[in-house]
């Protein structure tokens, strides 16, 4: 392998820079983050796991760092399958294991975009990763101890495969850590030497790591043999002596405490610790729901705060899932309601389709209707019938939009999935040229191009020069699609694509020279025309002399021909939309929405229009008529685009260099010719 190949920058995708040897072990695509690379693998591996990465780190950034150690075979940043966001870890494959060892020695805990990375050998075998051999657990750590300080402290006892300090979402230490040694003997030596020592003036606990399943089973055993009892709803007039007399008949106690505040007033609850589990169980059975001084007591096993919070969270989640299961398929979302609609009017319009359990029109803080509401039926069949009958129905001045209600996070996830699918389609069919926005460099509304998209029609000359009125514009820029009547005159609706200037008429149109057989007549040589096969002047299609084109790049108008009017916003109504063919309705809605969106988002108008056209036609018509509703949808689309673009922008910029390079090579070839 040449040195030039080894030092070339890595592409954004997982394209190997050089072929890897047969002995190399590469991590599986989308493999989960290993807790630690377990020892015992016999295969010589040159694959490193790099964790704790900033979400914006790309393959190219990692290549620049790791290629300084030695030739890199491939790099992959693992990403979410739907959103394509970085999962915070990557795999770096070297051509030989010696380079991997040097990278592990010199780059471990180094800063990448201001964040310390964690490097260890990749272990593909999950059985070896999860054995836990040589893995120790440390708790009661000082907040100032990080991964590097932990590694330096425990490296004296043996070869460390991985060490990690547990952190919260803000990156602060949670006071515990894990260290994984290559051998069990090293782990035993570390436990013997460090357990009970002071680290930064705090006494730490060090022991063998116990798996979560084993810990939970042990906790359940301890809970089943509880001796500490919690009693609440105790009358505030009950004294300590009366409380002891209440709990002592069930067995010998270790401690009895009735909680009081700083003023000595009872808080209404207390704790009793019995000597054995049988006494505690008997106290719970006898005292729970027993009436004392007119109050029913609650008695149960004493729980820690974290345990109570976990149970409370679990109960809330179960209740939420139960409510969702009850409303699945029966709860409808109704939009485009007139301002005067109330709950009774909403129920009256929908009660013909079945039994309504609840109906509500949503209002703001001042009591003004927000234009939407919810209707819940007793069965899914009734809800389905209401959707089929009421969706798109004109009641008052607006067509209703009726659909099954969805939670906000579900709608957001569906929208992100649509954006990810469009991104994959652009990658599959070829993205637009750099700098082109919306429709200029993409097929209509973000859909994949049809076969032959961007190619000339049969009998049409290939366009080598830029389009008229757009010097230097790319050749695949979307052209207008005017509609013609049988006499060949353009209809009023046949406007160019969203404000683009009229294009040169197709070959074969009146005034275009053709042979009797229908073929185009080649143009005669012209002194002002291109020479030696060079490109035509700006705005001149091949086959026409440049002198026949007036200044400004405009074709002369034919007799009785009138220019097509510019698209006007807000001219579309429900009646005209209903008269149009289904295939043309989306086009009409797009032509009406684009200028409205272009007023506030000129650069992203094309993308946002394509996103909104996924919606129902009735809802799109409402967006055309209601500027506040349209602005709300535009803002939502901008938020989704901003979040999705955080991870995709660096990769897109790198991928955009290839079309630029090809364009430069094409220009060089034309100069040589």
UniProtKB/Swiss-Prot annotation:
What Pfam families does this protein's entry cite?
Answer: MLLE, RRM_1
| Annotated region (Disordered), positions in chain | 1-39, 300-322, 509-572, 644-673
In the record, biological process GO terms are: mRNA processing; mRNA transport; regulation of translation
Keywords associated with the record: Cytoplasm, mRNA processing, mRNA transport, Nucleus, Repeat, RNA-binding, Translation regulation, Transport
Instruction: Give the subcellular location.
Output: Cytoplasm; Nucleus
Q: Does the keyword Membrane apply?
A: no
Give the record's GO CC terms. Answer: cytoplasmic stress granule; cytosol; nucleus; ribonucleoprotein complex
Keyword Nuclease present in the record's keywords: the answer is no
Gene Ontology MF term list: mRNA 3'-UTR binding; poly(A) binding; poly(U) RNA binding
Q: Where is the RRM domain?
A: 46-124, 134-211, 227-304, 330-407
Amino acid composition bias (Basic and acidic residues), ranges on this chain: 304-322
| Residue span(s) of domain PABC | 569-646
NCBIfam families documented for this protein: PABP-1234
Tell me the protein family, please.
Belongs to the polyadenylate-binding protein type-1 family.
Q: What does this protein do?
A: Binds the poly(A) tail of mRNA. Appears to be an important mediator of the multiple roles of the poly(A) tail in mRNA biogenesis, stability and translation. In the nucleus, involved in both mRNA cleavage and polyadenylation. Is also required for efficient mRNA export to the cytoplasm. Acts in concert with a poly(A)-specific nuclease (PAN) to affect poly(A) tail shortening, which may occur concomitantly with either nucleocytoplasmic mRNA transport or translational initiation.
How is this protein named in the record? Polyadenylate-binding protein, cytoplasmic and nuclear
Q: What's the source species for this entry?
A: Cryptococcus neoformans var. neoformans serotype D (strain JEC21 / ATCC MYA-565) (Filobasidiella neoformans)
Annotated gene: PAB1
